[in-house]
Amino acid sequence: MGCVQCKDKEATKLTDERETSVSQHAGYRYGSDPTPQHYPSFGVTAIPNYNNFHAPVSQGVTVFGGVNSSSHSGTLRSRGGTGVTLFVALYDYEARSEDDLSFRKGEKFQILNSTEGDWWEARSLTTGGTGYIPSNYVAPVDSIQAEDWYFGKLGRKDAERQLLSNGNPRGTFLIRESETTKGAYSLSIQDWDETKGDHVKHYKIRKLDNGGYYITTRAQFETLQQLVHHYSARAAGLCCRLIVPCHKGMPRLADLSVKTKDVWEIPRESLQLIKRLGNGQFGEVWMGTWNGNTKVAVKTLKPGTMSPESFLEEAQIMKKLRHDKLVQLYAVVSEEPIYIVTEYMSKGSLLDFLKDGEGRGLKLPNLVDMAAQVAAGMAYIERMNYIHRDLRSANILVGDSLVCKIADFGLARLIEDNEYTARQGAKFPIKWTAPEAALYGRFTIKSDVWSFGILLTELVTKGRVPYPGMNNREVLEQVERGYRMPCPQDCPSSLHELMLQCWKRDPEERPTFEYLQAFLEDYFTATEPQYQPGDNL
């Protein structure tokens, strides 16, 4: 059961979601992590009318909630000929420029213009102020999207991560779109027992033909709100009653502000470098602020590292890549020294985190989960037909609650330093690089898979340099002869077997990132269900 070959190589075969029904505590699933919901891209001039339950779908677009959810699609029409659909703030927001609007959670808005996609022009009914607001900070009044417990397109694994973090009590819950059943939802609840300790149970919420909802046919409800109210009063067959909605973190913004959405080359003087976080071969990383009010990370590149023109061209692509497991590129200063402005990650690089930070004490479940997050981000890069080229723990950043995000994707191609471009030069990361890429420059998503296998060794050894005791030349020679790193101390053989799959000589025989994500997310259920923590892992 544990061997990698026994599993189908393509995760697409693993499509039924593990959910628990009240009457049947069985059922197994795997669904790949969908591209997250945090960045609705509308490109429509009319806002769907969420309050008209029977409005025909005129645009074929559901701004919130996805297919057949309670986001009632249709063009914006006046109710009774006068009013408009009102939106409510889900979070506090502080204006970052003179064009956007500060507001508090619960404030209501009239939307004036939604053509900007990520930013909507709105009028606050509380203050009367007009300006741009981030569209993922608001939801239609009285919709399920406005409920604290509704998390939209959140994958099963991410639901578990959120419920099991921050010391949530038993009965903490959320509702999300089902990954596998169109129009259905999943109720995820944190539970506890003496055998498993803290864990999460998932229940499928099915939809009736007449529009109602049920977990078990014995109890049917017109709305999800009624369902939540019912199970908050009594468990009624669930593992426990619903106690408190899971804390919903602030959504990430796609841009620094509405002003930088299209013009994201920013003046150097708008950035303040506050604290140096790291120093690498090609520059430094700083924690800083933009406009004096927005915390960012700033990567400064040494002059001559890459051509500003080539960088700007690549940055146009990087800016379009949006996924929860990728560090978001916000803006650039393209004149030398080049500045790259991204979201700030509080715990720094995964390498430093494992070697010198809180990561030193992590056990295998956390480490495998971090690997699964990286695989999820790389699966998105795979779907977008992009390549990272320099995947290693130094280029993974860690945030609160052990969130991992991939940084520096695509930049390696642009480096013009001779010690790097020679590929066997001192600055080139030979130990992480697939042989066909190191020897012949054949960089593909499959060479990224090789690098991911090396990153797995970094995780289980808490940041040890790969191929200990060997220099770059020896590594290249030995790997060409068929040498592969042995199983690290205390690492389960099934995980080492996965590494060996990543290090197949023929790139096409290496697994996809979609498969790697599936394998790692299900690792302790399907592969190592008997895992017991040891001294090291």
From Swiss-Prot:
Which biological process annotations from GO are given for this protein?
adherens junction maintenance; cell differentiation; cell surface receptor protein tyrosine kinase signaling pathway; convergent extension involved in gastrulation; gastrulation with mouth forming second; myelination; regulation of cytosolic calcium ion concentration; T cell receptor signaling pathway
Can you give the residue ranges of the SH2 domain? Answer: 149-246
Activity regulation note? Inhibited by phosphorylation of Tyr-531 by leukocyte common antigen and activated by dephosphorylation of this site. Relatively inactive in the unfertilized oocyte, undergoes rapid activation immediately following fertilization. Total activity increases progressively during later development and remains elevated during sphere and epiboly stage.
Q: Please name the InterPro entries in this protein's record.
A: Fyn/Yrk_SH2, Fyn/Yrk_SH3, Kinase-like_dom_sf, Non-receptor_tyrosine_kinases, Prot_kinase_dom, Protein_kinase_ATP_BS, Ser-Thr/Tyr_kinase_cat_dom, SH2
- The Enzyme Commission number assigned here is 2.7.10.2
One matching Pfam family is PK_Tyr_Ser-Thr
Cofactor names: Mn(2+)
Its protein name is: Tyrosine-protein kinase fyna
Whose protein is this, by species? Danio rerio (Zebrafish)
Output the lineage of the source organism. Eukaryota, Metazoa, Chordata, Craniata, Vertebrata
